[in-house]
């Protein structure tokens, strides 16, 4: 998800997306630990997406 798309969302929607992405990251970490995750780059992409969402949420709240 691009930053421009995130900025068009409302604060509540961004928070919901953060929760969803955090849950997905938890599941991906668990799959990685058990050796079931084939695409390990997906874990890093999700981590960066959460960081991007949190950064833009702070911008919106100011």
Swiss-Prot record:
Gene Ontology, cellular component aspect: cytosolic large ribosomal subunit
InterPro entries: Ribosomal_protein_uL29, Ribosomal_uL29, Ribosomal_uL29_CS, Ribosomal_uL29_sf
CDD domains given in the database record: Ribosomal_L29_HIP
Keyword Ribosomal protein: yes
GO molecular function: structural constituent of ribosome
Presence of keyword RNA-binding: no
Alphabetic keyword roster: Ribonucleoprotein, Ribosomal protein
Pfam families (UniProt xref): Ribosomal_L29
A biological process term (GO) from this entry: translation
Family: Belongs to the universal ribosomal protein uL29 family.
Protein name per the record: Large ribosomal subunit protein uL29
Organism for this UniProt entry: Desulfatibacillum aliphaticivorans
């Amino acid at each position: 998800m691009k930053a421009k798309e995130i900025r068009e969302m409302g604060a509540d929607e961004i928070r919901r997306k953060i929760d969803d992405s955090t849950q997905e990251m938890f599941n991906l970490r668990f799959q990685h630990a058990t050796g079931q995750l084939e695409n390990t780059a997906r874990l890093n992409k999700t981590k960066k997406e959460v960081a991007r969402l949190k950064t833009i949420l702070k911008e919106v709240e100011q």
